[in-house]
């Protein structure tokens, strides 16, 4: 059975399918973690420790030595992505505060869901698209953009938006595993390769644990909102990133390729809620919305990027 290949055919499948399975188990057997305890209980409830390891491994893949082009390209896209998250967070906070919409067609929508969806780029998708329509330096620009990974900038954005702030210790704690990984990976290339191989392996495990804290009813309610948020991510961040790419000498393809939601962004609401319990009531719905945005952006971004590349006459590097 080609289970892995089947999962990979679904956009964000390594994140989304285990997330759904965890949610299904929690919906049908809500006391499973307590009933089985031991390692089974840890697998169902241990998403945060797995995420800590994930961010150490992710940090190890970030190279301090970047060429000026990589710094310029990656830095411009990274800063633009974060600024858009801040702007959306500030505007959203005026209407939603720390809570979420509890009825109507936008039920479950919160500032946390919006910011988490917009702050983090799907690195695998970006690098695959730039491998097709860009040059190797464009692919390498993700080494700078990957600094956006994790909950740190979402926490900062929520604080800037005037919502419940986080103690400095929590902010440091949110980014410390990434920094430790960066230091280790740059001190030893073999460690970088060793830890780097674990990044994709850990994704389905923390996704399953996150799903085990959710209910299918929450996912169902978040369906339409998640689709709308995904479209908003492509339109809003895509427009800003396209402009930033053009202003830094690009043709716009890199900007469009970065207008997505990372699979691991679905983990951010739970981490934020663990750091500040004011966000605990909105975290399950936010997780479902972000997961939906992962799928929607994974479908739309390649189509839009390929369309623009064709329009400006850029040849697919993978074409025969």
From Swiss-Prot:
Chief localisation class: membrane
Name this protein carries in UniProt: 2-keto-3-deoxygluconate permease
Subcellular localization, as worded in the UniProt entry: Cell membrane
InterPro entries in the record: 2keto-3dGluconate_permease
Spans traversing the lipid bilayer: 10-30, 42-62, 76-96, 98-118, 143-163, 165-185, 199-219, 224-244, 253-273, 288-308
Cellular component aspect of the GO annotation: plasma membrane
Keywords annotated in UniProt: Cell membrane, Membrane, Sugar transport, Symport, Transmembrane, Transmembrane helix, Transport
Recorded superkingdom: Bacteria
A Gene Ontology molecular function term of the record: 2-keto-3-deoxygluconate:proton symporter activity
Function according to Swiss-Prot or TrEMBL: Catalyzes the proton-dependent uptake of 2-keto-3-deoxygluconate (KDG) into the cell.
Recorded topology in the membrane: Multi-pass membrane protein
Organism name: Carboxydothermus hydrogenoformans (strain ATCC BAA-161 / DSM 6008 / Z-2901)
Catalytic activity annotation: 2-dehydro-3-deoxy-D-gluconate(in) + H(+)(in) = 2-dehydro-3-deoxy-D-gluconate(out) + H(+)(out)
Coiled-coil zones: none
UniProt keyword annotation of Transmembrane present: yes
Similarity comment: Belongs to the KdgT transporter family.
